[in-house]
């Protein structure tokens, strides 16, 4: 089985389980299984997938088809171009949070001093970046 065949099978599985971003999710999960970025994956679709990589990929696909978030499957989430370790006991930071952090940073620059309290809001990534 080559990368393209594995990818197509992953796409079919996720699509049939009504995962909205079935193509993107399949690409991300296959790339991660192969320890490649998505660009390198897409440039090498004719390469053969090793058995252990295939097993990892379809394990990921089976978890995703049950609606487990990609961040929990991979164990990390990108936030402000940095990867942060994530697990099921931590809320996954959303892209809206990046916008909020950006707005807070702009406001802080306008004024001299601010006190910020971040309690029980999830991963703590917003406070780390502020």
Where do the protein language model's features map onto the residues?
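Amphipathic alpha-helical recognition patches that constitute DNA-binding helices
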Residues: 25, 96, 115
